[in-house]
Amino acid sequence: IGMVIECKDGYLMEPNGCKRGCLTRPARYCANECSRVKGTDGYCYAWLACYCYNMPNWVKTWDRATNTCGRGK
């Protein structure tokens, strides 16, 4: 019996709708933050934000189409 587990990659998102920043964080900060939400790994991407791999679908990630960062929400 096999199971299909849906996973996604993406930028971690702060409650204010912005990407989770990592410019001044320690080297493993993003990997640790990604593992907290059950992702397999992560790193500080060129946009200076945490990018995670293989997170569960319930994790909210930043999306350009639904971006609310800086809009007071």
UniProtKB/Swiss-Prot annotation:
GO terms for cellular component: extracellular region. It holds the Pfam family Toxin_3. It comes from the Eukaryota. Expressed by the venom gland. Belongs to the long (4 C-C) scorpion toxin superfamily. Sodium channel inhibitor family. Beta subfamily. This is Toxin Td12. InterPro entries: LCN-type_CS_alpha_beta_dom, Scorpion_toxin-like, Scorpion_toxin-like_sf, Scorpion_toxinL, Scorpion_toxinL/defensin. Gene3D superfamilies: Knottin, scorpion toxin-like. Keywords: Amidation, Disulfide bond, Ion channel impairing toxin, Neurotoxin, Secreted, Signal, Toxin, Voltage-gated sodium channel impairing toxin.
